[in-house]
Amino acid sequence: MTTFQDKVKALRAHHEELLSRKNEPVEWGNGIYEKYKNLILTAEHTPLEWRYDFDEKSNPYLMQRIMMNATLNSGAIKWNGKYLLVVRVEGADRKSFFAVAESPNGVDNFRFWDEPITMPEDVVPATNIYDMRLTAHEDGYIYGVFCAERHDDDQPGDLSAATATAAIARTKDLVNWERLPDLKTKSQQRNVVLHPEFVDGKYAFYTRPQDGFIDTGSGGGIGWALVDDITHAEIKEEKIINARHYHTIQEVKNGEGPHPIKTDKGWLHLAHGVRGCASGLRYVLYMYMTSLEDPTKVIAEPGGYLLVPEGPEYIGDVMNVVFTNGWIADEDGKVFIYYASSDTRMHVATSTIDRLVDYCMNTPKDDYRTQFSVEKIKALVAKNKQTLSK
C-alpha cells in the first residue's frame, strides 16, 4: 500500500528531476541566436510548498491546494554571479505575482526562491500586477517597472473594462522593495522601461502611450520621455522614437522589451511587434539600435522579425505570441534572451553582442513594398552567384 509519505517522496523526486534537467541548444538555427530544447520555467517548476499542504491530517489526498497556471514575461538581471529572473507567475485564480528564480548558468536549473515577492501597494491598490522590466540604474538602485491593472470605474457595468498604469518599485536586494508612486502620464501606459543611465541629468523612460487598456488607438509606437524626480515621476512630454507602420510586424502595436544593452556601436533594443491576422493578434520580437550620443535617434532597424512562435510555442493560453521583457549581457559578450510563448511558459535563446549588432547593422530594412523586398532578394542572389563562382 502506498502511504502518504511515499506519495510525497515520489512527488519531490519528480519535481527535482524537472528542475535539474540539463538544457542544450537546438541543432539548427538561423545564425543569429540559438534556441534551447527545454523550457526553462513552467507552472510545474514552482515550489511544491506553494501548491501543496504537506500535513496529512489537513490534506490526506495530497491535493494541490493552490494551483499555478503559468510562468511568463520575466524581467532578468545578473546579480551576485547568478542569472535571476523576476517571473510573472499566474495562479489558477488569474492573479499574477512576482517571484525570483535563480540559475547558475542562465539556461537551466532555474529554482525559485522560497517565497514570492511581497510588493507594497500603491495608494490605489491594483487588482493585478505583471510584466516587470528590471533596470540596474546608475543611481545605485535596481528598479522594477511593471503594469498595474485596475478596474475602470468609469465603466461600472463592464466587468472587463480596465486601466493600465506603469508602476515603479526599487530595491537593493530583490527581496525588500520600496514602492514609488505610479508614473503619471496623459494616457494609459504599458511596456514602460527605465533607461539604465541618466540623460541630461534626468531619468529616461521608454513608453508606449495608448488610448485604452488593450488598444493603442492614437498611440504611435515606442516613446521616449525624461523625468526629473523618480520618486514622483511624471511625464509631461514624450516623443515617438520607433513608430508603427502599415503592413509590418508592428502594424497594430509595439512595445519595448527589456532595457537596451549598451555597445560601442550604439544601444541594442529588443521589442515586440503586433499585427492582426485571421486567428487574432500575432506577437513577434524584433530589434533596432539607437545612437549613443542621442538615444532617441534610430540608427539601424532590420526589416521583419527576429523571433517568432515555432512549433509548440504557438500553443498556450494566448495563442501565437512570443513576448520578452528580460535579457542579460554577460561580461564576455554572450547574451541571454528570455522570452515567453503564448503567455504560458518561459524559454531562453542565446547570442552575442557582436552577432546582434551585425544583425542590426547588416540586415536590410523594411521599405514597406513588395517590389523593394524582391529587389533585395535578387541582389543577394546576384552577390552569391558572384561569390560562389570564384
Where are these regions (language model features)?
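Short, surface-exposed ligand- or partner-binding patches at beta-edge/loop junctions that are enriched
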Residues: F336
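Well-ordered alpha/beta subsegment
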Residues: I328-G333
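Beta-rich carbohydrate-recognition and catalytic domains
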Residues: M1-N73, I77-T127, A136-V193, E197-V252, ...
